[in-house]
Amino acid sequence: MPRAQKGLLLVECDPTVKQLILNMDEQSPGIVIEEIDEERLLVNESRLEQVKAELERRLEENTYQVEE
């Protein structure tokens, strides 16, 4: 069980987004401090903006766009 520590955020997300974050952590270690369960992670607060930007990029990349 993790202890309280300054600079950590509890992130709750669906399993798909969680897997994307875990993949980011494999490529750039130090993002995820600990996996809590299927929908929760402890994330390094100083890397949160990087995670948000990368998630947005990856989700946009994988979203179907209708051409008009």
UniProtKB/Swiss-Prot annotation:
Family to which this protein belongs? Belongs to the TFB5 family.
Q: What does this protein do?
A: Component of the general transcription and DNA repair factor IIH (TFIIH) core complex, which is involved in general and transcription-coupled nucleotide excision repair (NER) of damaged DNA and, when complexed to TFIIK, in RNA transcription by RNA polymerase II. In NER, TFIIH acts by opening DNA around the lesion to allow the excision of the damaged oligonucleotide and its replacement by a new DNA fragment. In transcription, TFIIH has an essential role in transcription initiation.
Judging by the UniProt lineage, the source's domain of life is Eukaryota
Q: From the Swiss-Prot or TrEMBL record, give the protein name.
A: General transcription and DNA repair factor IIH subunit tfb5
Q: Name one GO cellular component term.
A: transcription factor TFIIH core complex
Question: Pfam families under this entry?
Answer: Tfb5 (PF06331)
Tell me the keywords, alphabetical order. DNA damage, DNA repair, Nucleus, Transcription, Transcription regulation
MF term (GO), any: RNA polymerase II general transcription initiation factor activity
What's the subunit arrangement here?
Answer: Component of the 7-subunit TFIIH core complex composed of XPB/ptr8, XPD/rad15, ssl1, tfb1, tfb2, tfb4 and tfb5, which is active in NER. The core complex associates with the 3-subunit CTD-kinase module TFIIK composed of mcs2/cyclin H, mcs6/cdk7 and pmh1/tfb3 to form the 10-subunit holoenzyme (holo-TFIIH) active in transcription.
What InterPro entries does the record point to?
TFB5-like_sf, TFIIH_TTDA/Tfb5
